[in-house]
Amino acid sequence: MQATIQNEFLSLTVDTHGAEAVSLKNAAGEELLWQADPAVWKRHAPILFPWTGKLKDGSFTYGGKTYKGGQHGFARDVEHTLLKAEGDTIQLELRPDEAMKAEKFPFDFVLTSTFRLDGKNLHHTLTVSNPGAEELRFGIGYHPAFQVPFDNSHTVEDYEFRFDQPESPVILDASGGGLLTGKCYYQWKNQQAIQLTNDLFDNDSFCMAGLRTRTLGIYEKDTGRSIVCDVAGFPYTLIWSALSKPVRFVCIEPWNSLPASVDDPQEWEQRAAAACLAPGGEWSTTLSTTFNR
């Protein structure tokens, strides 16, 4: 099932499967989100919950039981309940059933996804609450994919990622099969822009920590057209694209948690998390994106 809202600048469609934004068009009817070509990458803008990245050995343990889990959690792969689709807002909710708790994640939670259009801005708020009787630990992040080039008259080299100030981001190394190795390095020093090339992501994503910038966007250099994410307050921001040449899309991914590391314990309660909610607790985060095109 899908729901659509629009204003004078943007039209947004969200699918209840994964609570995923599957289309975002500007006033000219141009598609801004990647359209999930399965030959390249089959998703549009998945929600990452209740973990980000990979689990060590593809599993975790809790209460003496082992739970198998794929990359980026399971919220992106299950049906969410549509609560509201009117005016400028779409809102959905995910609550675990007994099968989900038995097979995937043995905790009670409520994950609410709220999409709101505001002029040329899309605000996507994820709220997690704990209705259960025990602590809820979780990871969470965003993974929107934006089509590039913006039109047929431009090529990949006409684009760059741009911070709002010069940056020397610390890159967390995940060369251990997608797991953090505990090493870090500098790929760029005192740079405000990162040139997009067809080989930029040959070694997968860049997970950046310690950013001071408020925004990170993808810019068309000759026109100034852009898609800009407000990444302030997120401890980690990734950039990524699939191994397709030429590059067909780029992802700007603000995360509140990290993948597992090569030496992580298997016990869920010993894993680093975005938040640890006591019974009755609530936590939220918002990604705001401005579409200047």
Question: Where are the language model's segments positioned?
Answer:
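Short Pro-Gly-centered flexible turn/kink motifs
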Residues: 14, 60-68, 275-292
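Short, structured beta-strand/loop micro-motifs enriched in basic residues and often containing a Trp
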Residues: 44-50, 262-270
